[in-house]
Amino acid sequence: MTANELTTGDFTEASEPFSLFGTWLKEAEKSEVNDPNAVALATVDPDGMPNARMVLLKGFDERGFVFYTNFESQKGQEILATRKAAMCFHWKSLRRQVRLRGPVEVVPDVEADEYFVSRPRGSRIGAWASKQSRPLESRFALEKAVAEYTARHAIGEIPRPDYWSGFRIRPLSIEFWHDRPFRLHDRLEFRRKAPDGDWTKVRMYP
């Protein structure tokens, strides 16, 4: 085993996580076949039972990581109750993973409105037609609701439902993982005690 097999190179020298994440995401956009911005989102219900599902990251900056959803959905209700969540990105083509967790805030209305307007018209209709996470009688019932809202909003802009908006995870920890031979992977974690605090960098055993 050579020294090169035990070290990854440059990413462990990063001084803060957001620029590094941006670099990794851009590389994933070139190599991943589908949805490089897909991420597993973990929440917890009132009984402490965890739930996980895939969502799409719609933005990130030094404030945090943003996704949008129906606030009356299971994930919406769980986040509103706990104000905490975790994410895990896995880019198989690059053999990389990024995990993060922290408190969650609701994005400002103006930010949610801007994103909602950018969505395809059919997706905006769907936000009205789908009672997300609730029992559905049949596919026909969903398609009927879509047809009704399509007729209702046949002309003009489609307003954003009050129950549909975005969440921003403000991470207290972000871990970067890169696959290495013999399971001697590289792990680099950034930690802070508060959403606006300074980052501490820690290299972790695989």
UniProtKB/Swiss-Prot annotation:
EC annotation from Swiss-Prot or TrEMBL: 1.4.3.5
GO molecular function: FMN binding; pyridoxamine phosphate oxidase activity
UniProt-annotated binding residues for FMN: R53, M54, V55, L56, L57, K58, Y68, T69, K75, Q97, Q132, S133, W177, R187
Cofactor(s) recorded in Swiss-Prot or TrEMBL: FMN
GO terms under biological process: pyridoxine biosynthetic process
Pathway recorded for this protein: Cofactor metabolism; pyridoxal 5'-phosphate salvage; pyridoxal 5'-phosphate from pyridoxamine 5'-phosphate: step 1/1; Cofactor metabolism; pyridoxal 5'-phosphate salvage; pyridoxal 5'-phosphate from pyridoxine 5'-phosphate: step 1/1
Keyword Acetylation (UniProt): no
Keyword Flavoprotein: yes
Reaction catalyzed: pyridoxamine 5'-phosphate + O2 + H2O = pyridoxal 5'-phosphate + H2O2 + NH4(+); pyridoxine 5'-phosphate + O2 = pyridoxal 5'-phosphate + H2O2
Enzyme class per UniProt: oxidoreductase
Record's subunit section: Homodimer.
Function per UniProt: Catalyzes the oxidation of either pyridoxine 5'-phosphate (PNP) or pyridoxamine 5'-phosphate (PMP) into pyridoxal 5'-phosphate (PLP).
Identification of the protein by name: Pyridoxine/pyridoxamine 5'-phosphate oxidase
